[in-house]
Amino acid sequence: MSNAVATTTTPALSPKFVLLMATACGLCAGSAYFNQPLIYSIEKSLGISTSQAGFAVVLAQIGYGLGLMLLVPLGDLLNKRKLIVSLMVFAAFSQILLSFSSNLAMLYFFTVCATFGAISAQVLIPFGSSISPPESSAAIVGKLMSGLVMGIILSRTFAGFVSTYWSWQAVYFSSGIITLLFAGLMWTKLPSTAANKNLTVAGTYRSLIQLAVTQPHLIRRACAGALGFAILSLVFTSMTFVLANPPYYFSDFQIGLFGLLGVIGIFSSSWSGKTVGKGRENFVAILCIGLMLFSCIPLFFAQQNIVAYAVGVLMSYFGLTAFHVLNQNLVYRIDATARSRINAVYMTIYFSGAALGSLTAVYAWQHWGWMGCVASILIFAVGILLIDRYDFRQQER
């Protein structure tokens, strides 16, 4: 998008258009989470170990992170509509090819490709912020994040349902077709933006390093967000291990249904956007960190009481999603003309937390069981608290 678009007065976005963008965010981001409830189904289908199937979850986050680092920065340089649609088409074909995986190499390769292209949501969010009037920008980010969160939530339920009644391959094939159809819709509805001729590809990537070096506030918010996402990723990756084993013995579909608890994230994203817009950033931060920290108490009893487990999941999900919206609004204020690049730096670090959380879940479960997972959540939450409080003190100076 050109600088002119970012700096001139723009009319309020229509509710239908915001809904369209939010749906696109959910569709794209959700595909990176299909394999979380499918670990045991993939293991059985391909004849591989649980840890090998679980590593596909880690690779999904790595692929998404690579896309964030390499492609999202181009949102400040290229025509955003072309970039978004191209990424959706690439992701769609990768998902279709993933559905034909017959060995571990194909599973891993096309998992990375599919999630590499799924980052179009991360181009769309700063785009929506840039074309919004300043007074509604925070609320728009919250609504788009609500769509993204809903996509992630429903993706697990969709994957569990299709896998239980058809196969895990059908999950990716059907999603690929839907994504292709939606890419066509996005091409007709999204506004076209001119390429920024003042930027070059090399200059864009250099500016990422410059942002990382000169904006410690950005790095601190990203690191705090990454640890929060590590908590959530750990909770949802280990959910299959907890619920598919005694005493619950849930199916893929039942695990996906349990994941619907994450619907709380829709309300927390919207609430956070509105509350931050009123200037209550510190209140949001303290509440969110408290929820993530104290979620360890009910999560400790996950294998004994399903209600306690549900409460812990709700607390961690609300805390992380609201905290993420807070962080995005804080870092977008750094430079309105570089929001795609700022988002790239923030989200690359943020999604490294997802990979860390997934990897920690697999490793901790293998070596220490559920108690190892809960201890890891507590460590991550303490890290968030320390980084967040230090950042707020630095910003007050």
Cite the ranges covered by each PLM segment.
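Juxtamembrane intracellular "pre-TM" segments in multi-pass secondary transporters
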Residues: N3-A12, P191-A222
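Conserved MFS/SLC helix-loop-helix module at the cytosolic interface between two early adjacent transmembrane helices
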Residues: L66-L104
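Helix-to-loop junctions at the C-terminal end of transmembrane segments
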Residues: L68-N79, S268-E281, W365
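Structural signature of the two symmetry-related core transmembrane helices
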Residues: K82-I96, F283-P298, L378
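Helix-loop-helix hairpin linking two adjacent transmembrane segments in secondary transporters
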Residues: M106, K143-L190
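Cytoplasmic helix-loop-helix junction between adjacent transmembrane helices
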Residues: T111-G147
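Intracellular juxtamembrane helix-capping segments at the cytosolic ends
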Residues: S120-S132, A322-D335
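C-terminal transmembrane helical hairpin of 12-TM major facilitator-type secondary transporters
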Residues: N282-N327
